[in-house]
């Protein structure tokens, strides 16, 4: 009986103990704080009750905020010489530390927030100093990213398309190398409050397989600081320089080769008979007009600049060679017809000789109407009115050399035609050689000398 009562006592004591333990655990579970929901956490971090003010920068009245910038280029193109600008699509990423956003209450190491939360935090007032036009992307939603880390680091990424000014030096066009810049600057905060700097690794990244229609984007990126000084203070500024080397394929096909063929075509007139005036004149005028049109077309897509470009020199020299070929035929035609002018001059001269000259000339035997030998004048020269000398008798017995026999009209015609043909023969060699020498100097200067000058800048 005693053992049974003892056993029942111990059993009752055990039940009471476990009941008390269970009740304490339930009470502890009820009294333990519930895990904070994301909404409650954000309200506590940057809501109205948090004391966070997006109008005030981090470290207010303290050291400036350092903002690390990074650019990822999605596309690069639409480089326009007439407006001197270029179009680029980029991801702009900014990172800074805001101690007010550091947290320990939430288990995640970082929070990716909705873009609508951007209005609730402070952001740098970055703008592009050489921007001519820009727009954000909102398809299918705002292309923006906001990420907050446990230590208060903030990552702000945004996708934008920019049209940026790019002053170009077209002296070497179309063998030029252009440098286009992108300047990132603070609009309102001076360097006492905000400093921009490039990210140490991969500050400027380019999408794989990115190609440009007319340019080669060189791999080296020139990153610089461009601090601006205004009346309102000194403002932070950073810039990236993109070196673009123009490809000549399009211009060789559209400008250089056609103009070269037109110049060669103008040389065909040197092998055409000089008597075929319609053919040679028609060919010369056609090549001149074609070359003029080609020269005008080469300037259609370029701005009206005050200096001379490489393409202008090429077109001007080609036009000069074509026009010179036309003038060459004018010279050939003029020389070949000179014998007619000479014969006409001779006939005119004989027609205007004084009739008195016949009184002083001997008739085959020296017995003319007046025989000056009888008067002792000898072979002296009497000067007629038109300058014709007549032999007299008192010239100290000296005689003038007999006049050279004049050439016949046919001989004169052949002489001048040979001279004209000689001009054509010289032109057949002279024009190509002169154009070849010009090409040697042209390509050496623009492809080697000036290119080295550009790279050394």
UniProtKB/Swiss-Prot annotation:
Tissue expr: Detected in spinal cord neurons. Detected in brain stem neurons. Detected at lower levels in hippocampus and cerebellum. Detected in the inner plexiform layer of the retina (at protein level).
Keyword Signal on entry: yes
Cleavable signal peptide: 1-28
Keywords: Cell membrane, Cell projection, Chloride, Chloride channel, Disease variant, Disulfide bond, Glycoprotein, Ion channel, Ion transport, Ligand-gated ion channel, Membrane, Metal-binding, Postsynaptic cell membrane, Receptor, Signal, Synapse, Transmembrane, Transmembrane helix, Transport, Zinc
Membrane topology: Multi-pass membrane protein
Positions annotated to bind glycine 1: 93, 157
Name the record gives this protein: Glycine receptor subunit alpha-1
Organism: Mus musculus (Mouse)
